[in-house]
């Protein structure tokens, strides 16, 4: 039996808007694109989606912007896949003296970056040509647009001795710990198909589980993987899990069909009608609170070895 508490996207959007506003008020944050109408009276859905994604990480990490033990003050930072710049804006506010490079070939920022933030539209898959080294390289939710092992090697070369690289990324497939997500559930089938299609594109969506290994191979030390769960919907009993599930469901559904159709039809060769019928079934299961599914979310960080005799912070301090 499907337990679906939201009749339509408007009901879901209203529930998310109320929940987000309460969270922002409690955490003292500005709305920055969340559920705000543009001058023509419409909402900017993509800006809204990225802003909500930032709040998902904010809640997941208990308000932290990173887990790496950075020096204070941090002097130079490179953010890869900046997107709407919400993370960069927040980091710059907390670290006003830091020089920050915000890298994204297709930025969507509508937030003033400030004088200390330098926009950079170069392709991070190409050789990096930065003229300075960084104390911290950060990358969040690049959605498999990057060659990750290559990224780790270039980050290693671009970091100062003792500097940190941190990746924050959702992984696939959706999984469950209590048997409510069967192998033949459309949601499980969808996850397997996403992995199949992404591997054909040489951008596997299950790569984040390998990040720590690749970091170590690139030369990083003091590497750590911290795993979190983003529920598929508000099925958890605890308040934090329920909130994460509510926001995550809305965030996923904003681009669910666009993203999935592209992989099923263009990569795997499905007929459009078959893809849409199948995805309708997947959507039902995404919203089914009787299915206790979640996406693994990984925060993986590692340090370039410090110079001998330096006073650089390590994770053991």
Curated annotation (Swiss-Prot):
Please give the InterPro entries that the UniProt record associates with this protein: SAM-dependent_MTases_sf (IPR029063)
Q: Which GO terms describe its molecular function?
A: catalytic activity; methyltransferase activity
Question: What keywords sit in the KW lines?
Answer: Methyltransferase, S-adenosyl-L-methionine, Transferase
This enzyme's EC code(s): 2.1.1.-
The conditions that induce or repress this protein are given as: Expressed during both sexual and asexual development. Expression is positively regulated by the secondary metabolism regulator laeA.
Tell me which Gene3D superfamilies the record gives: Vaccinia Virus protein VP39
What does the protein in this record do? Probable methyltransferase; part of the gene cluster that mediates the biosynthesis of terrequinone A, an antitumor agent. The first step in the biosynthetic pathway for terrequinone A is formation of indole pyruvic acid (IPA) from L-tryptophan by the aminotransferase tdiD. The nonribosomal peptide synthase tdiA then immediately converts unstable IPA to didemethylasterriquinone D (DDAQ D), via condensation of 2 IPA molecules. The symmetric connectivity of the 2 IPA molecules is thought to arise by head-to-tail dual Claisen condensations facilitated by the TE domain.
UniProt protein name? Probable methyltransferase tdiE
What species is this protein from? Emericella nidulans (strain FGSC A4 / ATCC 38163 / CBS 112.46 / NRRL 194 / M139)
């Amino acid at each position: 039996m499907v337990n679906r508490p939201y009749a339509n996207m408007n009901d879901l959007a209203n529930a998310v808007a109320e929940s987000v506003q309460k969270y922002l008020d409690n955490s003292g944050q500005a709305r920055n694109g969340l559920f705000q109408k543009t001058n023509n009276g419409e909402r900017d859905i993509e800006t809204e989606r990225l802003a909500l994604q930032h709040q998902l990480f904010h809640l997941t990490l208990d308000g932290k912007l990173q887990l790496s033990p950075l020096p204070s003050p941090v002097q130079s930072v490179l953010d890869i896949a900046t997107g709407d710049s919400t993370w960069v804006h927040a980091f710059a506010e907390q670290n006003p003296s830091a020089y920050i490079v915000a890298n994204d070939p297709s930025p969507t920022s509508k937030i003033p970056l400030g004088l200390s933030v330098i926009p950079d539209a170069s392709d991070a898959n190409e050789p990096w040509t930065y003229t300075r080294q960084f104390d911290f390289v950060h990358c969040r939710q690049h959605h498999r647009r990057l060659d990750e092992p290559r990224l780790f090697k270039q980050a290693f070369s671009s970091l100062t001795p003792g500097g940190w690289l941190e990746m924050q990324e959702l992984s696939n497939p959706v999984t469950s710990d209590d048997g409510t997500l069967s192998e033949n559930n459309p949601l499980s089938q969808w996850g397997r198909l996403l992995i199949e299609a992404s591997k054909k594109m040489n951008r596997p969506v299950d790569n984040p589980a390998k990040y720590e290994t690749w970091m170590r191979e690139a030369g990083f030390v003091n590497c750590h993987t911290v795993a979190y769960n983003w529920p598929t919907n508000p099925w958890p009993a605890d308040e934090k899990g329920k909130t994460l599930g509510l926001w995550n469901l809305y965030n996923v559904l904003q681009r669910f069909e666009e993203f999935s159709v592209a992989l099923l039809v263009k990569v795997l060769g499905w007929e459009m009608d078959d893809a849409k019928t199948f995805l309708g079934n997947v959507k039902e299961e995404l919203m089914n609170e009787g299915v206790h599914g979640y996406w693994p979310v990984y925060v993986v960080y590692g340090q370039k070895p410090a110079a001998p005799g330096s006073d650089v912070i390590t994770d053991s301090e």
